[in-house]
């Protein structure tokens, strides 16, 4: 099925979920490319463009021997509001990050929060225009974020 055959809601939901899949796979280049023409807001930090986001994630995320962060981002409660006339949309969702690291960390939730997104339609396809990431809680991030490992 071509992208244009999918409803706007479905195309946008696919972008939201693709973000999780690419991050969990450790595919930082394609992860960053989701934001080639978009802002990525994390706390006080605002970055624009895929390479800047790829570099940020690469500098903060622990990548394990299998080439992944050994995580599963679970995105839920997705609420999408589309303005077809103006080719724009907004979405809100919640996320939880599960992680396990064999012999290091049992399966657990290492973080959770909210995404607030804006999308724009260009060339008959939907793209991120802005993603704001809010962290509401964290767990044991020693094997998820660089600089968190204890001695």
Residue ranges and their predicted role:
Residues 1-33:
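Short, low-complexity N-terminal intrinsically disordered segments enriched in polar/charged residues
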Residues 10, 71, 108-110:
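Transmembrane beta-barrel outer-membrane domains
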Residues 23, 35-36, 95-97, 132-135:
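Short beta-strand segments enriched in hydrophobic/aromatic residues
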Residues 28-96:
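A solvent-exposed, acidic/Ser-Thr-rich amphipathic alpha-helical stretch
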Residues 88-90, 112-143:
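Short beta-strand edge/turn micro-motifs at domain boundaries
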Residues 95-99, 119-121:
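Beta-strand elements of well-folded, non-transmembrane domains
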Residues 98-108, 138-139:
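Short, cysteine-centered beta-strand-loop-beta hairpins and adjacent loop/turn segments enriched
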Residues 141-151:
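Extended, polar beta-sheet/loop recognition surfaces of beta-rich domains
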């Amino acid at each position: 099925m071509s992208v244009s055959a999918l409803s706007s809601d479905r195309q946008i939901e696919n972008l939201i979920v693709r973000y999780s899949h690419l991050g969990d796979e450790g595919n930082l280049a394609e992860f960053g490319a989701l934001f080639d023409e978009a802002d990525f807001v994390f706390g006080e930090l605002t970055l624009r463009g895929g390479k800047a986001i790829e570099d940020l994630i690469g500098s903060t995320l622990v990548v394990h021997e299998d080439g992944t962060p050994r995580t599963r981002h679970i995105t839920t409660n997705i609420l999408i509001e589309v303005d077809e006339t103006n080719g724009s949309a907004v979405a809100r969702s919640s996320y939880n990050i599960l992680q396990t690291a064999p012999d290091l960390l049992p399966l657990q939730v290492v973080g959770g929060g909210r995404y607030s997104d804006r999308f724009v339609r260009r060339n008959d396809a939907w793209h991120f225009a802005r993603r704001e990431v809010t962290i509401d809680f964290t767990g044991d991030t020693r094997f998820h974020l660089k600089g968190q490992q204890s001695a």
